[in-house]
């Protein structure tokens, strides 16, 4: 994970710099895209395939998956707190929004991988579905509850 994180150039977040001149949608695309790229590296894909297949019978595999999910949720909470402070998005409950968002992104990634592995549908559809979700999420959590707000730049 740490090697994949390094290769994806994921580092400490300076939210002011990340947010500068970007819409909420652009920010979420950037953040989710980094996470997707990290997890699509060959070593990470192989690791996850093994962990996924073992987690229902091996406590250590389940623990690894739970810890990764907790890291993803924590990172999402931090992002959402920063987006709220910078008035980019507004959340009724930032913590639960982060859980919902992180789990949905994770589920969409899994869904896309399953379709790709099963040669059921092109991986491009996964990107379309993820982007549709990100657009919907921005509209639902716009500061003024106005779709146009997601187009405003910080």
Regions picked out by a protein language model, each given a short descriptive name:
Residues 1-31:
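Amphipathic alpha-helical linker/stalk segments
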Residues 92:
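Beta-hairpin "wing" of winged helix-turn-helix
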Residues 1-5, 39, 104, 109-111:
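Feature detects amphipathic, helix-rich regulatory segments
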Residues 12-19, 49-54, 115-119:
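Short linear capping/connector segments at secondary-structure termini
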Residues 22, 26, 38, 42-46, ...:
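Amphipathic alpha-helical packing segments from all-alpha helical-bundle domains
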Residues 18, 32-40, 48-56, 132-137:
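Helix-loop "lid/cap" segments that line or gate small-molecule binding pockets
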């Amino acid at each position: 994970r740490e090697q994949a994180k390094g290769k994806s150039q994921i580092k400490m977040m300076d939210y002011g710099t990340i947010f500068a001149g970007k819409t909420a949608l652009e920010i979420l695309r950037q953040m989710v895209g980094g996470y997707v790229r990290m997890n699509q590296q060959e070593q990470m894909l192989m690791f996850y395939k093994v962990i996924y297949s073992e987690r229902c019978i091996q406590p250590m595999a389940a623990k690894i998956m739970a810890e990764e999910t907790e890291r993803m949720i924590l990172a999402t909470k931090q992002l959402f707190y920063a987006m709220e402070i910078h008035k980019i998005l507004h959340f009724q409950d930032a913590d639960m929004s982060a859980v919902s968002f992180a789990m949905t992104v994770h589920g969409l990634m899994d869904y896309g991988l399953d379709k790709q592995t099963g040669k059921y549908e092109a991986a491009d559809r996964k990107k379309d579905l993820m982007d549709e979700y990100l657009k919907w999420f921005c509209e639902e959590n716009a500061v003024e509850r106005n779709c146009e707000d997601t187009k405003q730049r910080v």
